[in-house]
UniProtKB/Swiss-Prot annotation:
Function: Acts as a component of the MCM2-7 complex (MCM complex) which is the replicative helicase essential for 'once per cell cycle' DNA replication initiation and elongation in eukaryotic cells. Core component of CDC45-MCM-GINS (CMG) helicase, the molecular machine that unwinds template DNA during replication, and around which the replisome is built.
Gene Ontology cellular-component terms listed: MCM complex; nucleus
Name of protein: DNA replication licensing factor mcm6
Note: Early fractionation of eukaryotic MCM proteins yielded a variety of dimeric, trimeric and tetrameric complexes with unclear biological significance. Specifically a MCM467 subcomplex is shown to have in vitro helicase activity which is inhibited by the MCM2 subunit. The MCM2-7 hexamer is the proposed physiological active complex.
Binding-site residues for ATP, renumbered to this chain: S473, T474, K476, S477, N578
GO biological process: DNA replication; DNA replication initiation; double-strand break repair via break-induced replication; mitotic DNA replication
Biased composition (Acidic residues): 61-75
Chief place where the protein resides: nucleus
Gene this chain is encoded by: mcm6
Length: 867
C-alpha cells in the first residue's frame, strides 16, 4: 500500500516533534492567501441562471419558467439552484445528506470567481491542498457545526474534489514538470485492487515509557516518530501504533491504460497507476473509460526501501562480498553514481497519479444491456454522481428531460416514426452496401432481450450473440469496427492473437503487496457492452472452450492462486469467422465449413453466411458505392439517423421490458416444433442441431423486436419476424447441387429433389454431369451409413451390392419409386457410394474387388453423424 499525507492539516500533525524546544512556526503566506480566497469563494459564489439566447427579448413569466425548466441541469449533470443562497453551501448540505465526506468543486466556477486563485491551484495544487481543506473545515464549522463535531469525533477525513479542469494531459505526456500541478487524464481502467484502509495520521506509543507521540502525517510510506517526547527516554525505533487515536481513510489502486486514439503509430499503450481515496473508491470498474483529475507525484519505492540496510540495490551483485562495500556490510552508494551505474542501479522512486475525482466518459445508461429487475442499474455511481445521486434517470420521461433540447426533439421524432425498424436498419453501418439481413441481426443485438432470473436465482441471459461467416472482403470486420467506433464498453479483439486468459480473466501478482489480483480480459471489460471477436475460427480449441460459460451463463469462474470467484461477463458477442480453406464451400454444411465446435455454435443466436459471388449488376452497384465513399466520405451516406440518435433511442428503449402474451407463447412453441421436425425429417437440412437454445433465441429476438418498436408486449408479428431471421440463419444453407459423376448411359442429367424423385433430361446431347440436390444427397448418404451401422457389420463390412439391394427394396416397399425407376435409382446409388468413398471419406473399402459391386465397405473411423 502507498501511504500519503492526504487529509492532514498542518496544525494537527507534526512530522518532527521536538522534545524541549518550541520553535516559532513560519507561516506560508501563499497558503494563507489561498485559504482566505477559497473561503471567500465558498461563501460568496452563486450560480446564475442561464437564459436561452432565443428568448432574450421575451421577459414574460412563462418564458422565464420555460427557461428554468429547460436548464434545470447544467452541462456537468448538476442540478442548478436559485441564487438566493451560496451554491456550495447547498452542495455541502447535499454532501452531509448523502453521508459523504468529499465536496466536489467545478473548477470553471473557481476560475470565473478568481482567476488568480485558479491559476495558483493549477500550478501548485499539491502544496496548496492543505490550505483549501482548512478553508473547507472553517466553512463547515461556521454553517454546520454539528457535522463538524461528528467529523472530529469519528476522525472523518474531509476532501475537496475538482472536476472540469481545463488542463488535460495524455498519459505519455506526464513529465517531471507536471509534478504537484493539477491536471486531468483519461484512460481505460484495466485493473482495480480491493479497497483497503490507509493510515493518514498516525498516533504512536513508545514501547519503553508508554508516552504518546504527536500526530504523525504519513509521507507516502509508514512513518514513525524520530524520537520519544519523554526527556528521560532515548527511544527512537521501538513504537506501537495507537489505532484509537489514528486516522484512516479508504484507499484503492487502479491501473489505467491510455486510450487507443491517443497511441502514436508504432507504439505500445502506456499504463499508469492511479490512487483513489475516500468517496472516489469503487467508482471505476475494469473496462470503464474515465477521466481522472488529480496531481502527479513521485513516491519512494517502498518495496525497495523496506528490505533493510543490506538491500541489494545492484542486480546480481552481493552487497557484502564485492569491492566497494564497507566493513560493516553496507554499500557505500552516494547520490552520484556516474556513467558506470547507468541502467544498473534500481530506481528508488516511481511516478504515481493521485486522483481526487473520477468521471466516466459515458453515462451508465449507455450500457447496452439492462440488468435483471432488482439489480442496481449501472452498477456504480455515475461520473461525479456523488454530488447528487438523484440525477440518474429512472424512467423514460426522466431520461428525455435529461437530454439537450436538440437531442430530445430528434428522439421524439424517432419515437413517432412509423417505419422505425427499416430506418434503423438503413442507419446501421451505412458505409456497407447491402447486407440488410446482417444489419437486422446486429440491430436486434444492440437492443437485446430481457434479462431474467428463475426462482432458483439462475440467470437467463437476454443478450444476443451473432456470428458472421463468409468469404474474404465481404465487410465482416467492418461491422465489428463500426460498433467499436460509437458504442460504449465495446471491446475489439482478434481470436488468433487472444488467449483464453486474455478473453476471460487472469490472476496477476501485485509487485508491491505480493497479493494476487484478478486482471480483466476482453469479456470482462465488455461487461454490459459488446465484445467483437474477429477471426473467431482461428482460436485454439482450448481457448474456444474457455468462453462457453461466458456466452451462456454470462459469468467467468476462476480458481487460481487461492482465488475462487465468479465474475460477471454480461456481454453480447459479435464474431466474424472465415470458412475452412478461405472460401465457403457450398457443397458442405455450415458446420463443415467452420472450425468451430457444436457446443459453441449452439450458443450463437444468429448465423449469417456471406458469399462473394460474381454478379455484374451487384458488382457494379458495390463498386459505385465504394467509389462514392472515397470521393464524398460522410456525404456519400444518406442515413436516416445519426449515431448519436441511435444511441439515445437504444438508451430510451432500455426502460421497456416487454412481456409475452398467451397467443405469442403458442406461436413460439409452434415455430420451435417445426424447427425440430426439420432437424429429424430431413426435408430441410439445418446448419446444426436444433436444441432448446434455439427456442430461447426465438424468445430473445422477439423481445428485442418488441423493445425496438416500444411495445410492452411481444406481439405475434414480432415472433414471426424472429422466426424468419432464425430460419434464414440456421435452416437456409448456401449449397450447390452435388456433382456425382459423368453419365454415359443417357440416363439422368439432373436429379431433382421432387416428390417422385424422377430424373429429368437436361440437354439434347445425352452427355453431361449427373448432379443431385444437396439435401437429397445428404439424406441418402446418412441412410446408407446408418444401415451399415444397424446391420451389425461395422467391423466386418458389407458388400456394396447388398447395401444397394437393401436401399432399392426399401424404396420400392415405401412406394417412393416404381419398377421402371429401379435401374435409374441403382445407378444413382452407385454414384453416391463412389462419392462417399472418394470425396467425402465417409466410407472405406475394406476388401477391394475387380467388380465394384462385390467390394466390402465399412464406415470411416472419423465419420460423424452430426456433420
Amino acid at each position: 500500500m502507498i501511504y500519503t499525507d492526504a487529509g492532514v492539516d498542518e496544525d494537527k500533525a507534526t512530522i518532527r516533534p521536538n522534545q524541549t524546544h518550541q520553535f516559532q512556526k513560519v507561516q506560508d503566506e501563499a497558503k494563507e492567501w489561498t485559504k482566505n480566497k477559497f473561503l471567500e469563494f465558498l461563501n460568496n459564489f452563486k450560480l446564475k441562471k442561464k437564459i436561452d439566447k432565443n428568448n432574450n427579448n421575451n421577459n414574460n413569466e412563462d418564458n422565464e419558467d420555460n427557461n428554468e425548466n429547460e436548464n434545470e441541469y447544467d452541462e456537468n449533470g448538476i442540478k442548478k439552484e436559485k441564487i438566493d443562497k451560496s451554491y456550495y453551501r447547498q452542495q455541502v448540505e447535499r454532501m452531509i445528506k448523502n453521508d459523504k465526506s468529499s465536496l466536489y468543486i467545478d473548477f470553471l466556477h473557481l476560475e470565473k470567481f478568481d482567476k488568480g486563485l485558479g491559476k495558483a491551484l493549477l500550478m501548485e495544487y499539491f502544496r496548496l491542498e492543505p490550505a483549501i481543506r482548512q478553508g473547507l473545515s472553517i466553512f463547515i464549522q461556521k454553517y454546520f457545526p454539528s457535522f463538524m463535531e461528528r467529523v472530529n469525533k469519528e476522525r472523518i477525513v474531509l476532501s475537496i474534489c475538482c472536476y472540469n479542469v481545463s488542463t488535460f494531459v495524455h498519459i505519455r505526456e506526464l513529465r517531471s514538470s507536471r509534478i504537484g500541478s493539477l491536471c486531468s487524464i483519461s484512460g481505460t481502467v484495466t485493473r482495480t485492487s480491493e479497497v483497503r484502509p490507509e493510515l493518514v495520521i498516525g498516533s504512536f506509543i513508545c514501547k519503553d515509557c508508554n508516552t504518546s507521540s504527536l500526530p504523525i502525517a504519513q509521507q507516502f510510506k509508514y512513518t514513525e516518530p524520530t524520537k520519544c517526547l519523554n526527556p528521560l527516554c532515548s527511544n527512537q525505533r521501538r513504537w506501537k501504533i495507537n489505532l484509537e487515536e489514528s486516522t484512516f481513510t479508504d484507499w484503492q489502486k487502479v491501473r489505467v491504460q491510455e486510450n487507443n486514439s491517443e497511441i502514436p503509430g508504432g507504439s505500445v499503450p502506456r499504463s499508469l497507476e492511479i490512487i483513489l481515496r475516500g468517496d472516489s473508491v469503487e467508482t471505476a470498474r475494469a473496462g470503464d473509460t474515465c477521466t481522472f483529475v488529480g496531481t502527479m507525484n513521485v513516491i519512494p519505492d517502498v518495496s525497495k526501501m523496506s528490505i533493510g540496510n543490506n538491500a541489494q540495490i545492484i542486480k546480481g551483485v552481493a552487497s557484502s562480498t564485492k569491492e566497494g562495500s564497507n566493513a560493516n556490510g553496507k554499500d557505500d552508494f552516494g547520490g552520484v553514481g556516474g556513467l558506470k551505474d547507468l541502467g544498473v542501479r534500481e530506481m528508488n522512486y516511481r511516478v504515481c497519479f493521485f486522483s481526487q475525482s473520477v468521471r466516466s466518459n459515458v453515462s451508465t445508461l449507455s450500457s447496452i444491456n439492462r440488468k435483471e429487475s432488482g439489480d442496481n442499474h449501472g452498477g456504480h455511481s455515475h461520473s461525479v454522481g456523488i454530488i447528487d445521486e438523484d440525477l440518474e434517470p429512472e424512467s423514460k420521461e426522466s431520461f428525455l428531460d435529461s437530454l439537450p433540447k436538440k437531442e430530445k426533439d430528434s428522439l421524439k421524432k424517432m419515437i413517432k416514426s412509423k417505419k422505425i425498424y427499416q430506418n434503423l436498419v438503413n442507419s446501421i453501418c451505412p458505409s456497407i452496401f447491402g447486407h440488410e439481413e446482417i444489419k437486422r441481426g446486429v440491430l436486434l443485438m444492440l437492443f437485446g432481450g430481457v434479462h431474467k432470473k428463475t426462482p432458483e436465482k439462475i440467470r437467463l441471459r437476454g443478450d444476443i450473440n451473432v456470428c458472421i461467416v463468409g468469404d474474404p472482403s465481404t465487410s465482416k470486420s467492418t461491422f465489428l469496427k463500426y460498433l467499436v467506433s460509437f458504442l460504449p464498453r465495446t471491446v475489439y479483439t482478434s481470436g488468433k492473437a487472444s488467449s483464453a486468459a486474455g478473453l476471460t480473466a487472469t490472476v496477476v501478482k501485485d509487485q508491491e503487496s505480493g497479493d494476487f489480483n484478478i486482471e480483466a480480459g476482453a469479456l470482462m471489460l465488455a461487461d454490459n457492452g459488446i465484445c467483437c471477436i474477429d477471426e473467431f475460427d482461428k482460436m485454439e480449441p482450448g481457448d474456444q472452450v474457455a468462453i462457453h460459460e461466458a456466452m451462456e451463463q454470462q459469468t467467468i469462474s476462476i480458481a487460481k492462486a487461492g482465488i475462487h470467484a465468479s465474475l460477471n461477463a454480461r456481454t453480447s458477442i459479435l464474431a466474424a469467422a472465415n470458412p475452412i480453406g478461405g472460401r465457403y464451400d457450398r457443397n458442405k454444411t455450415l458446420k463443415q465449413n467452420l472450425n468451430i465446435g457444436g457446443p459453441l455454435m449452439s450458443r450463437f443466436d444468429l448465423f449469417f453466411v456471406v458469399l462473394d459471388e460474381c454478379n455484374p449488376e451487384s458488382d457494379h452497384r458495390i463498386a459505385e458505392h465504394i467509389v462514392l465513399t472515397h470521393q464524398k466520405r460522410e456525404k456519400a451516406f444518406n442515413a436516416p439517423f445519426s449515431a448519436t440518435e441511435i444511441k439515445n433511442y437504444i438508451k430510451y428503449t432500455k426502460f421497456i421490458c416487454p412481456t409475452i402474451p398467451d397467443e405469442s407463447v403458442q406461436l413460439l412453441v409452434g415455430h420451435y416444433d417445426r424447427l425440430r421436425q426439420m432437424d429429424t425429417s430431413g426435408s430441410k437440412t439445418p446448419a446444426y442441431r436444433i436444441t432448446v437454445r434455439q427456442l430461447e433465441s426465438l424468445v430473445r429476438l422477439s423481445e428485442s423486436l418488441a423493445r425496438l418498436h416500444l411495445d410492452t408486449k411481444v406481439l405475434p408479428k414480432y415472433v414471426n419476424e424472429a422466426a424468419r431471421l432464425l430460419e434464414k440463419s440456421i435452416v437456409h444453407v448456401e449449397t450447390n447441387d452435388v456433382i456425382l459423376g459423368d453419365d454415359d448411359d443417357d440416363l439422368v442429367k439432373n436429379v431433382e429433389n421432387d416428390n417422385d424423385n424422377h430424373a429429368e433430361e437436361d440437354g439434347d446431347d445425352g452427355i453431361g454431369k449427373l448432379t443431385m440436390n444437396f439435401s437429397k444427397y445428404s439424406q441418402l448418404s446418412k441412410l446408407l451409413v446408418l444401415q451399415i451401422k444397424q446391420s451389425g457389420k461395422e467391423k466386418s463390412g458389407i458388400k456394396q451390392i447388398d447395401l444397394i439391394d437393401w436401399y432399392i427394396k426399401d424404396q420400392l416397399e415405401s412406394g417412393i419409386i416404381t419398377d421402371d425407376e429401379v435401374t435409374k435409382e441403382t445407378k444413382i446409388t452407385k454414384m453416391v457410394i463412389n462419392k462417399m468413398i472418394n470425396k467425402d471419406n465417409s466410407l472405406v473399402v475394406l476388401v477391394p474387388n475387380q467388380y465394384p459391386d462385390h467390394r466390402i465397405l465399412i464406415i470411416h473411423p472419423n465419420y460423424s453423424f452430426d456433420k
